[in-house]
Amino acid sequence: MITRRALLQSVFASAIWTLFKNPAFAAQPASMKDVEALQKNWKLLLADGTKLPLPSEPLKLSKEDWRKRLNPTQFNILREEGTEPPGTSALNNEKRPGVFVCVGCNLALFTSDMKYDSGTGWPSFFTTIPGVFANKTDYKLILPRSEYHCIRCGGHHGHVFDDGPPPTGKRWCNNGVALKFIPKSGSA
């Protein structure tokens, strides 16, 4: 006969095993100190020799030049604040070590260590590389949302919500088409 204590221990062990084998939870930082370390050491995920622009190097182009530089979907999202349909980005399943950059200007925005599976259908991150986004309030859906734009080129990337995992509680919900992934093993 199984005792209540043995049953509870079994259920608890099973829950812990499920939690830690799920990649959406396994790599989450335990504290804000861990998040700060990810933010500080993001360059460790760059491929050797990768050169990326700095946030202090603004990129200003005319609307016509942006149309030449971006494909129509990228232009709609980055320059006209559109949103891609959920589940359409190949970056949802990107799990290799590396850095996510703005497709418009190559500014580094996130690392693979900052990414998690939010189940929303968009690439999601619990934090960002510091100083790369400017936020503004978006009223397109009547209720206000916090929208974020690349500090270098002004490109719209997505919205930040307060329903992310601990310790930040943030979900940076990004349009995948607005990002380019540079794997650590490759080059820019």
Predicted regions and their residues:
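N-terminal secretory signal peptides and thylakoid transit peptides that target proteins
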Residues: 1-15
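Intrinsically disordered, low-complexity regions enriched in Ser/Pro/Gly/Gln/His and often acidic
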Residues: 10-12, 35, 59, 115
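A short Gly-Trp-Pro
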Residues: 46, 53, 58-61, 67, ...
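C-terminal segment of N-terminal export signals and the immediately downstream linker at the start
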Residues: 18-64, 68-69
